[in-house]
Amino acid sequence: GFLSTVKNLATNVAGTVIDTLKCKVTGGCRS
């Protein structure tokens, strides 16, 4: 349903943001 789609998008965005912050903090960017 719509809510689960929104939840999945929010989870993906949060994961991306967290990965980016970790990467900047540790200097271990892969991209």
Curated annotation (Swiss-Prot):
<dbReference type="Pfam" id="PF08023">
    <property type="entry name" value="Antimicrobial_2"/>
</dbReference>
<dbReference type="InterPro" id="IPR012521">
    <property type="entry name" value="Antimicrobial_frog_2"/>
</dbReference>
<keyword id="KW-0929">Antimicrobial</keyword>
<keyword id="KW-0964">Secreted</keyword>
<dbReference type="GO" id="GO:0005576">
    <property type="term" value="C:extracellular region"/>
</dbReference>
<keyword id="KW-0878">Amphibian defense peptide</keyword>
<comment type="similarity">
    <text>Belongs to the frog skin active peptide (FSAP) family. Brevinin subfamily.</text>
</comment>
<comment type="function">
    <text>Antimicrobial activity against Gram-negative bacterium E.coli.</text>
</comment>
<protein>
    <recommendedName>
        <fullName>Palustrin-2c</fullName>
    </recommendedName>
</protein>
<keyword id="KW-1015">Disulfide bond</keyword>
<feature type="disulfide bond">
    <location>
        <begin position="23"/>
        <end position="29"/>
    </location>
</feature>
<keyword id="KW-0044">Antibiotic</keyword>
<dbReference type="GO" id="GO:0050829">
    <property type="term" value="P:defense response to Gram-negative bacterium"/>
</dbReference>
